[in-house]
């Protein structure tokens, strides 16, 4: 059984903010400097892992203290995850690396119900977190003999090319009229409880991208793993688990002709996937990561409603930004097309309740992380009308149960509440069980160990959305579209 170690990192902000610096993610004009200091809490029956199942970080953002809770994304890789590259003489070399003890995490900010986080802890902390509606990126500064990290906003990254970057999918390109008409209906709250679905994703890296990263396969692997971790986080609200099934790097040469005409390349890649890749490894959808510049400022393309189709369950994504978060948003967008989603602008005046969302035809600044109501409608209609079978089954992987750790703010196996302090009036710190008479110990719909009354406001509305309200049956504050 995998044991858990709870870790607290105190990040002290450096006395000054940097004005400009060159990072892996690009040139950044304004950033904060933080220094990790590791403080280890005593776990229960701890057996040291290289990467803990649950971690906690403290840092200051804009001078305010922030607590970041992280939990390992155990569904990131399939159990039979494989990596393939090619020798100089063209031989295919496939390995099945052990990825159970990996370094990719999801999480949230303490006391911020709308927060999210997607972090790699492989070599310092790298990724993003959303705090009070703002997206921040964090990455190591790579200074000698230093644990310094930079925290900054996406808008502070210098843009090399200000031309708008577009998705190549057009309104009626590979669309289905009956699907499109049905998707104009608003979903009822019951319909918006999306069923659990699983996508086993194959990612293929073309030879141009291999050369771009100086023939460094390890660097490409880390980049792809970070990318899929981010994609997985963005699809969680739709109850879709994205699992990386295989990674193939065309290290010797391209196995199709990669052309600047994106529609031609997509067709060739779809044919190759159907006739070659699917016969070697089972998976649900394949996307090609490429370094080529597509004509028309296009950075991505996919077949709409193509999921589970042998030829059409494919997409193209240009690795056009050094910031992996940006490329992850593009692939999230193209996967949305595979799942039946159209562009938000293509709704004939219908309000989508989102100014900048993932399915906007042009990538926004900063890149969007949310799906609009229109996208949710499209996805629901796709599930109803097409019922794609390949995404029904959960991917094979080792299901590990964490050993309970008090105070990590995640409920582990056998816990009814997160123990924390022995003085907690609702939760018994010795057993991690609720005290007699207690219904809950924490949560936005918990007050003095009892569930708040039904329809009590637990999260104030933002924009056009209604307030979120308690159900009276749980300590959780459900999104309005989950009620």
UniProtKB/Swiss-Prot annotation:
It comes from the Eukaryota. Residues 197-395 form the Peptidase M12B domain. It is found in: Secreted. Glycans are attached at residues 263, 293. Its EC number is 3.4.24.-. Expressed by the venom gland. InterPro entries: Disintegrin_CS, Disintegrin_dom, Disintegrin_dom_sf, MetalloPept_cat_dom_sf, Peptidase_M12B, Peptidase_M12B_N, Reprolysin_adamalysin. GO terms for cellular component: extracellular region; plasma membrane. Gene3D superfamilies: Collagenase (Catalytic Domain), Disintegrin domain. GO terms for biological process: proteolysis. Zn(2+) binds at residues 333, 337, 343. Its cofactor is Zn(2+). Residues 403-483 form the Disintegrin domain. Residues 21-190, 396-413 form a propeptide. Residues 1-20 form the signal peptide. The active site is at 334. GO terms for molecular function: metal ion binding; metalloendopeptidase activity; toxin activity. Disulfide bonds join 308-390, 352-374, 354-357, 417-432, 419-427, 426-449, 440-446, 445-470, 458-477. Belongs to the venom metalloproteinase (M12B) family. P-II subfamily. P-IIa sub-subfamily. This is Zinc metalloproteinase/disintegrin.
């Amino acid at each position: 059984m995998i044991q858990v170690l709870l870790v607290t990192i105190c990040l002290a902000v450096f006395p000054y903010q940097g004005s400009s610096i060159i990072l892996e993610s690009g040139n950044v004009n304004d950033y904060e400097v933080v220094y990790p200091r590791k403080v280890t809490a005593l776990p229960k029956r701890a057996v040291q892992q290289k990467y803990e199942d649950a971690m906690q970080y403290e840092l200051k953002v804009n001078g305010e203290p922030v607590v970041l809770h992280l939990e390992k994304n155990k569904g990131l890789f399939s159990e039979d995850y494989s990596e393939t590259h090619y020798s100089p003489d063209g031989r295919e070399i496939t390995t099945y690396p052990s990825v159970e003890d990996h370094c990719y995490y999801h999480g949230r900010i303490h006391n911020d119900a709308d927060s999210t986080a997607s972090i790699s802890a492989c070599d310092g902390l790298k990724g993003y977190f959303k705090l009070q509606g703002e997206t921040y990126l964090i990455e190591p500064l790579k200074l000698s003999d230093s644990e310094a990290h930079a925290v900054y906003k996406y808008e502070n990254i210098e843009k090399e090319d200000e031309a708008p970057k577009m998705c190549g999918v057009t309104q009626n390109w590979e669309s289905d009229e009956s699907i499109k008409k049905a998707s104009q209906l608003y979903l009822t709250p019951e319909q918006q409880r999306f069923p659990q679905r699983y996508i086993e994703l194959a990612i293929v890296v073309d030879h141009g991208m291999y050369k771009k990263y100086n023939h460094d396969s390890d660097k490409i692997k880390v980049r792809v793993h970070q990318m899929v971790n981010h994609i997985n986080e963005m699809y969680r609200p739709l109850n879709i688990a994205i699992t990386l099934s295989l990674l193939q790097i065309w290290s010797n040469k391209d196995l199709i002709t990669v052309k600047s005409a994106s529609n031609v390349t997509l067709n060739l890649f779809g044919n190759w996937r159907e006739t070659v890749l699917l016969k070697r490894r089972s998976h649900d959808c394949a996307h090609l990561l490429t370094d080529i510049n597509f004509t028309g400022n296009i950075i991505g393309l996919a077949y709409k409603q193509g999921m589970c189709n042998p030829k059409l369950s494919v997409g193209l994504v240009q690795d056009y930004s050094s910031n992996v978060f940006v490329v992850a948003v593009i692939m999230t967008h193209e996967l949305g097309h595979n799942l039946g989603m159209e562009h938000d602008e293509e709704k004939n005046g219908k309000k989508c309740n989102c100014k900048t969302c993932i399915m906007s035809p042009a990538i926004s600044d900063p890149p969007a992380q949310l799906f609009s109501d229109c996208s949710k409608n499209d996805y629901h209609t796709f599930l109803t009308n097409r019922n794609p079978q390949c995404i029904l089954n959960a991917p094979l992987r080792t299901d590990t149960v964490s050993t309970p750790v008090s105070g990590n703010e995640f409920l582990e196996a056998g816990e009814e509440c997160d123990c924390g302090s022995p003085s907690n009036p609702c939760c018994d710190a010795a057993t991690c069980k609720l005290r007699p008479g207690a219904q809950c110990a924490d949560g936005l719909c918990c007050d003095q160990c009892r569930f708040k009354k039904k329809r009590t406001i637990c999260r104030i509305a933002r924009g056009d959305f209604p307030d979120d309200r308690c159900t009276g049956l749980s300590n959780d504050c459900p999104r309005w579209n989950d009620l």
